[in-house]
Amino acid sequence: MLPIGRWLLVVLAAVACATIGASAAQSGIVMTGARQPVASRVNALATASPDTVTSSNWAGYVVGATGAGTSASTTFTSVSSQWVQPAVACAPGESSYAAFWVGLGGASDTSQALEQIGTSSDCRAGTAAYSMWYELVPAASVKIKFKVFPGNVVAASVKVNGTQATLQIKNLTRRTKFTKKLRISAPDLSSAEWIAEAPSACNNSGRCIQLPLANFGTISFSRAATTAAGHAGTIEDPNWALTAFNLIEEPGVLAGPIAAQASPNGAAPSALSSNGASFAVAWQEAIAPPDQSGSPPG
C-alpha cells in the first residue's frame, strides 16, 4: 500500500514498466489498483446502509462484510458479473485507459491483496485497443490472449477456496472461455467489487502514477452476484454493506507528459436495477475535482 496525500490510499496491483511518463502511457503497460478516500471508504463499509464515496480511480459498487447478515470476520468467496465491452473514443495521438473488472478484496485500508479479472478499452497513441487480463495482487497482471471487441458480451468470475483462486472470463459473443487456477498465500476476501477503473502505471522501483481515463462512453454490468458466509446474493443483498463509488480523476496524481494531456474527467454508476444485479457506469467529461482544502469527508 502506498499513502498519497492526506487521505488517499493506493492498493497497488503491480505491473512494472521501464519508465513513467509518456513512454509508460504509449507502451500500453498499465496496472490496476485502488485509490480511495480512506475516511469515506472505511465509514461506508462499517454501516449496513448504502453510501456513496468519491475515488480518484474507481467507479461502480463495492460490498463489505458488515451488513445485517454478516460480521467483520465474514469472507466473500466468489464474485461474478456480465458486461458489454464498451467502445473507446480516441482523439489523434491520445493515450488513455479504462479497465472493467470483478474482484475480491482491495477495498480495505489494510489490504495487501486483490483478486480480479476483466477487460480494458484503451487509446494508445490515438488507436483503440481492447484486451482481457487477470491479476492477483501483489503479483503482476497477466494479459489473456483471447480477443474482445466493442459490443461483445463478457462474463467474468473470481472464486477463492482456501488458498486456491479460480479466475474465469468468457466472451459469450465469440464463444471463447479462459480459466486459470492459481495458488495465493494470503487472499483478501473482505469485500467484493464491480468496477470501471482509471488504471495506473509503475516503474521497476514501484513508483506509480495514475493514467488518464479513456472515454469509454457507458458500460453496462448485469447478473452481478457474490457469495459470503455461504450466502449467495446480488449487489443489493441486505446481508452486506453496499457502497457506490464515483470516480473523479486527480490531476495532481499525474506527472510529466501524461499530466499535460490529462483533464479531471470521471465516471459515475447508475442506480441499481430493481433486482439489485444490474447497473451502468457512464464516463463524464471534465468533472470538477473535490475540495482538497479541508478535512476528508465522512
Language-model regions, residue ranges each:
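Bacterial N-terminal signal peptides that target proteins for export
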Residues: 1-9
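Exposed, interaction-prone regions of secreted/extracellular proteins
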Residues: 25-291
